[in-house]
Amino acid sequence: MASSEIHLIALKLVKYSDRQSILTAYSLEAGCVSLAIPMGAGKAASRTRALTMPLSILTAVADVEGKREIPPLRNPVPSPPLCGVNSSPLKQMIAMFVAELLSVLLKESQPDEAMFRFLVSSIQILDCADGREVANFPLAFLYNLARQAGIEPDRSTYRVGSVFDMRDGLWRDTVPLSHHDYLGTEESRIAATVSRITMENMGRFDFSRAERNRALDLMLEYYTMHYVSLRNLKSLDVLRSFV
């Protein structure tokens, strides 16, 4: 099949040889893909590397359905440029965390237009966010991603004083008897608060750093139980120091 235009979200760039790096990206047309990009010192190679920073949104040309195991990426163009992310160290750190998380979650994924549109919209929101919106973005993103992935907790079950059952993804009036994967009442209350967060209202939530980090840990553990293990994310510790 001839090369054609594809729409990409850059996730991870790894050096493959002195001449090539491998870009892992999530595409509208083919799901998760690996693409070869040049590693030279020339302007074209430098520009391509700059355009493939974590969470960059691109259009490019590649033969993702051909016989080549790792097809080359050609003619990448930002769509749109992420000026806010590129100018903010905090947003860059969040982008690194989200990109690493997605490279694990979407590793074997097939094309999913709804997921791709959600990711593009979320990245554009991060690009324009400020203040408390930026600090709360990882929580808002993770919770709303759970909805896209089909593992969103049932927040309609929350009652004051209830406990959150991590296995079943709902709040209970009493602790489950068959396992110990549940939260105490205070953490269950925080979990219920997080369940109300959206990309539109995330700036209204006034979490302390300790609450934010604990909520982040619990959400990653929830994903690990219901989707895929997220216990070894290298960017997590650095993210904690930022938010």
Regions found by a protein language model. Give the residues of each.
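Non-catalytic alpha-helical scaffolds and adjoining flexible linkers that form interface surfaces
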Residues: M1-I22, Y26-V243
